Amino acid sequence: PVSDKGKKPVPAGDFKAVDSARCTPVDMQKVFNANVTDIFRNEYLSPRSPYTTLQLPKQGIGEWCHPLKTADIDDSGLRATVRKGLLETKLGIPFRTPAEGHNIAFTSLWDNYPDSLQIPLQGKASRAYLLMAGSTNHMQCHIDNGVIRVYYEDGTCDTLSLVNPDNWPPIEQIFFEDGKSFNRHAPSLYRLRLKTGELSNNFGEELGFTGVSREVDGGAAVLLEMPLNAGKKLSHLVLETLSNEVVIGIMGITLQR
């Protein structure tokens, strides 16, 4: 299926080809620059317009009529699930993540974080599994919020656009989908609840949500699958934020050889 504009949604991946024995988690400790819980505890003060605007409140969430809105992101369950630096998911994909200390690499057009960052990769892989978390808003719907570029040693690269609501959700909630007015034209995203460590693509039903508002207690990361050219040697991955007023972070990369 396609959207009303005839544009196919950006795929998040179906995770049907996961081979746990071939999965290699990438050590990202040197590029982590924050705790995922920091996202709405910061003050995003620049760049800002010097004039009266309807821009986001300084905490990075909310709107002009809800200036004090926030969301308490709690990663205690995720950290409690980590064993010897590894998070095992029910999809069979392990991610390297610390039980203590910084556990995400954030990017943003706000000055709090770099616009982009680079993560070294090695060897060859058929796909990359990404554990990501960040913010997005109504104004960033149906546009590229950010982009993942995986470069090979020959200078070429593969790209994965991060588009709300195709494959880029807000950390504080899951999407309401009814197949009608609220139709993503794509399978539901796999989300990892940070407060419990649970993974599912059906939290709407499992958590008993009945209305449109579906805020997740503690927040949730998202799992994405990115196909790669298995015949080429990898060089590095670049995460870049493209849209104003969002924060995009990567918590884990696992390569399937």
Where are the regions a protein language model picked out?
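N-terminal/edge-of-domain interface segments
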Residues: P1-R257
